[in-house]
Amino acid sequence: MKKVVAIDGPSGAGKSTVSKEIAKALGFQYLDTGALYRAVAYYFSIKFNYIDDFSLLTEQEIEEELKNIKIHYKNGRVFLSGEDVSDFIRDPKIGEITSQLSTQKVVRDFLMPLQRSFAEKVDIVAEGRDMTTVVFPDAWKKFYLDASPQVRAKRRFEQLIQSGKKISFEEALRDVIERDKRDCSRENAPLRLSKDAFYIDTSELTLQEVISIVLKKVAEDA
């Protein structure tokens, strides 16, 4: 396995932006594992006509559908059966479906080999919910980015408004709290702080400050 910088944390903690910049600074490839889960969710949303509750599907039904999914990830873009779905998977509705499906063990088992395969070829910065604990437990460097629910909701609210989506701050906060509950309480690979991960609370830090802290820590322990 090549060098892996694994970054975990809840939704809205700044993982994606920080991870991209860290990868750029180190000359590593960036792996957005959340995009892989979103691609699966996008497939299921189309297949089942955007049903609201995917818990209605049995594990066997999900497993059968996974056999039809072919995901390719390159340069930050996600392809589903050859189609670039990178923009479609960012829809808030897909995010909700992703949060539901990611609790399923069959989905996590399906994506595990794909995620790990990237580290066999190149040095990577991998961000997600279980990078430091499950996918890359022996990662070269481990970080956990966090922030208060209010701060994360504000970031999500501003991001969605800028992208043209209509949402209130209260809705954004409720979504963050619900995601936290699902991520931390799920039976399979719950979100948790790895004992050997470096913890960073980004609530009152600028993006550049977070990046500087991560790069300094990487340099110190290199």
From Swiss-Prot:
<dbReference type="GO" id="GO:0004127">
    <property type="term" value="F:(d)CMP kinase activity"/>
</dbReference>
<dbReference type="InterPro" id="IPR011994">
    <property type="entry name" value="Cytidylate_kinase_dom"/>
</dbReference>
<keyword id="KW-0963">Cytoplasm</keyword>
<dbReference type="InterPro" id="IPR003136">
    <property type="entry name" value="Cytidylate_kin"/>
</dbReference>
<dbReference type="GO" id="GO:0006220">
    <property type="term" value="P:pyrimidine nucleotide metabolic process"/>
</dbReference>
<dbReference type="GO" id="GO:0015949">
    <property type="term" value="P:nucleobase-containing small molecule interconversion"/>
</dbReference>
<comment type="similarity">
    <text>Belongs to the cytidylate kinase family. Type 1 subfamily.</text>
</comment>
<feature type="binding site">
    <location>
        <begin position="9"/>
        <end position="17"/>
    </location>
    <ligand>
        <name>ATP</name>
    </ligand>
</feature>
<dbReference type="InterPro" id="IPR027417">
    <property type="entry name" value="P-loop_NTPase"/>
</dbReference>
<protein>
    <recommendedName>
        <fullName>Cytidylate kinase</fullName>
        <ecNumber>2.7.4.25</ecNumber>
    </recommendedName>
</protein>
<dbReference type="GO" id="GO:0036431">
    <property type="term" value="F:dCMP kinase activity"/>
</dbReference>
<dbReference type="GO" id="GO:0005524">
    <property type="term" value="F:ATP binding"/>
</dbReference>
<keyword id="KW-0547">Nucleotide-binding</keyword>
<dbReference type="Pfam" id="PF02224">
    <property type="entry name" value="Cytidylate_kin"/>
</dbReference>
<keyword id="KW-0418">Kinase</keyword>
<dbReference type="GO" id="GO:0036430">
    <property type="term" value="F:CMP kinase activity"/>
</dbReference>
<keyword id="KW-0808">Transferase</keyword>
<dbReference type="GO" id="GO:0005829">
    <property type="term" value="C:cytosol"/>
</dbReference>
<keyword id="KW-0067">ATP-binding</keyword>
